[in-house]
Amino acid sequence: MKKISRKEYVSMYGPTTGDKVRLGDTDLIAEVEHDYTIYGEELKFGGGKTLREGMSQSNNPSKEELDLIITNALIVDYTGIYKADIGIKDGKIAGIGKGGNKDMQDGVKNNLSVGPATEALAGEGLIVTAGGIDTHIHFISPQQIPTAFASGVTTMIGGGTGPADGTNATTITPGRRNLKWMLRAAEEYSMNLGFLAKGNTSNDASLADQIEAGAIGFKIHEDWGTTPSAINHALDVADKYDVQVAIHTDTLNEAGCVEDTMAAIAGRTMHTFHTEGAGGGHAPDIIKVAGEHNILPASTNPTIPFTVNTEAEHMDMLMVCHHLDKSIKEDVQFADSRIRPQTIAAEDTLHDMGIFSITSSDSQAMGRVGEVITRTWQTADKNKKEFGRLKEEKGDNDNFRIKRYLSKYTINPAIAHGISEYVGSVEVGKVADLVLWSPAFFGVKPNMIIKGGFIALSQMGDANASIPTPQPVYYREMFAHHGKAKYDANITFVSQAAYDKGIKEELGLERQVLPVKNCRNITKKDMQFNDTTAHIEVNPETYHVFVDGKEVTSKPANKVSLAQLFSIF
């Protein structure tokens, strides 16, 4: 058999087993763990290539015949970092491995059969990840949705009704009528969406009514009063309906301290938002809950990574987001109690230790909706530069750290909110919400986004040019955004109770409507690559953070990767 050099092979088919790829301008190095394509039998589309009838394309159409095949992709997922063909059929991932013509080629499985009905997308030299999931959305403006989508986020979970003061401060869509409006508004967008109801009440009937109206869970927020009673009742109803509860705890410790909140939670599962505390929560020690077995702890992106500008930036943001007044002494003291450089410094380290499990945005309410993915990778890179390789790494690569940080915005938020059966990873049977990246722009600017198996967004040149590539090249909506295609390509998540009662038909929804499930039978141990539990304490006078008796902190960065170099114009 004729052989070619590794350099020639990579240029034709992309990296193979043992090859290493740098992610953007970071120090993070991904190494290909396995190549499922077969040497000499690789798929390649184009003039004089192999994707043609009688070669890699079968002339015997079958029911397994793919709608789309992505060839020779480098998949970066919590399940592994590996090379494979990805087959898509009926909007889902039908197969991962060796695609082609099983009548002519070895190793081709039925679920990766290429036929006359199959479209081809060249994945050689590209990285494929699952679409990101942002679970901390203030639905203040609908313009957030395309902004997040262009960053690689394909699922948004949160609450709100637009720029009302309640929404500016809290991720809550309160009540049946508001949920109806938001569920109907969701029809317009290329984004999977789910809405959180108001959990700040001790009235079980009111809580239940919101879940039956289509909410996928509750948000309890201090601006509405995060009392032990509200926590207990929301969790009681959540347990009954199998939905998640997210919480922003009591910064002022009005109704109790962190110990009182944990007593009210009573060992039940809860998703804690901005668990470090700068975004809100028991001052100064909400961060200690991150080590508990029943807590699914999240960060929001304004505090990660910790930089020389973080502290100064937060004061003005906080005053606006929580309707505070700089002329009122108590409001200023409230803000000061939340912005603690010591706990922010510890946050980066806790992410690197796998104690913090999820990253999210806190969109337009101190966080940036288009930067969840970028800031997650900036944090990973900052921590590698400061602390070196993780002890869990095997070989001369950063694969473990890469899986740890990828999981924070893909599979872990999916598990937390009961949607991991559908989205959150590159696995057979899941919805084909996929993001394609050039390695040089990984984490900053996707090359293309596939939504429900159909191309929804892509970098595209002048529409009047003779080929697709002439400038100006920028993101443009593709056909999955338009007409009734957007209904097939996107999902509205609801509770099982609302699904069973026919919420789709009741509200006249045309999008896919799917129920969340398995929200209450999970713990920290279900958080992939981020399941570390520990005893965390905060010194009440200095705010220094200790994990199992050892102080943890990090230095503020004066320069980060994936930044201005990629945004010159």
Swiss-Prot record:
Amino-acid positions noted as binding Ni(2+) 1 in the UniProt annotation, renumbered to this chain: 136, 138, 219, 362
Active site residues of this protein: 322
Residue ranges occupied by any Urease domain in the UniProt entry: 131-569
Localization: Cytoplasm
InterPro entries noted in UniProt: Amidohydro-rel (IPR006680), Metal-dep_hydrolase_composite (IPR011059), Metal_Hydrolase (IPR032466), Urease_alpha_N_dom (IPR011612), Urease_alpha_subunit (IPR050112), Urease_AS (IPR017950), Urease_asu (IPR005848), Urease_asu_c (IPR017951)
Cellular compartments per GO CC: cytoplasm
Record-listed substrate binding positions: 221
EC class (word): hydrolase
Cofactor note: Binds 2 nickel ions per subunit.
EC number(s) recorded for this UniProt protein: 3.5.1.5
Catalytic activity: urea + 2 H2O + H(+) = hydrogencarbonate + 2 NH4(+)
Cofactor(s) listed: Ni cation
Keywords of the record: Cytoplasm, Hydrolase, Metal-binding, Nickel
The keyword Cytoplasm is assigned to this record: yes
Pathway(s) this gene product operates in, as recorded in its UniProt entry: Nitrogen metabolism; urea degradation; CO(2) and NH(3) from urea (urease route): step 1/1
GO biological process entries: urea catabolic process
GO molecular function ontology, one term from the record: nickel cation binding
Residues that bind Ni(2+) 2: 219, 248, 274
PANTHER family in alphabetical order: UREASE
Family affiliation: Belongs to the metallo-dependent hydrolases superfamily. Urease alpha subunit family.
HAMAP family given in the database record: Urease_alpha
Protein's name according to its UniProt entry: Urease subunit beta
Source organism per UniProt: Helicobacter pylori (strain G27)
